[in-house]
Amino acid sequence: MARLAGVDIPREKRLEIALTYIYGVGKTRAHETLAATGISADVRVKDLTDAQLVELRDYIEGNYKVEGDLRREVAADIRRKVEIGSYEGLRHRKGLPVRGQRTKTNARTRKGPKRTVAGKKKAGR
């Protein structure tokens, strides 16, 4: 397996798809990277030369924040919002959706499994 930005890239996949295994590189960035380096998107990772791998590695690490740096930056942004007490920070702290989604129903991924609350008992006859 080839390593780019500290990630093992799958050898059998097309390069455009394989680059998306790097955190911070989606289809658009993969396409931009290949256009800038002049490498075909249809090439398989196993067919790349060492020079092409070095060129890709230098371009990605030089132009984009990826993997650990990006994860740290995102975590720092969330931490800052929590510390200053913004609305978004409060939502993060409470474990609720941050971007305005409804919570009366749905939002189960963010809220976790249902916790049953005792309700009214049925009146006997």
Curated annotation (Swiss-Prot):
Pfam annotation, one family: Ribosomal_S13
PROSITE patterns xrefs: RIBOSOMAL_S13_1 (PS00646), RIBOSOMAL_S13_2 (PS50159)
Species: Arthrobacter sp. (strain FB24)
Job of this protein: Located at the top of the head of the 30S subunit, it contacts several helices of the 16S rRNA. In the 70S ribosome it contacts the 23S rRNA (bridge B1a) and protein L5 of the 50S subunit (bridge B1b), connecting the 2 subunits; these bridges are implicated in subunit movement. Contacts the tRNAs in the A and P-sites.
Key word rRNA-binding present: yes
Entry protein name: Small ribosomal subunit protein uS13
Record-level GO BP terms: translation
Similarity remark: Belongs to the universal ribosomal protein uS13 family.
Region annotated Disordered, chain positions: 93-125
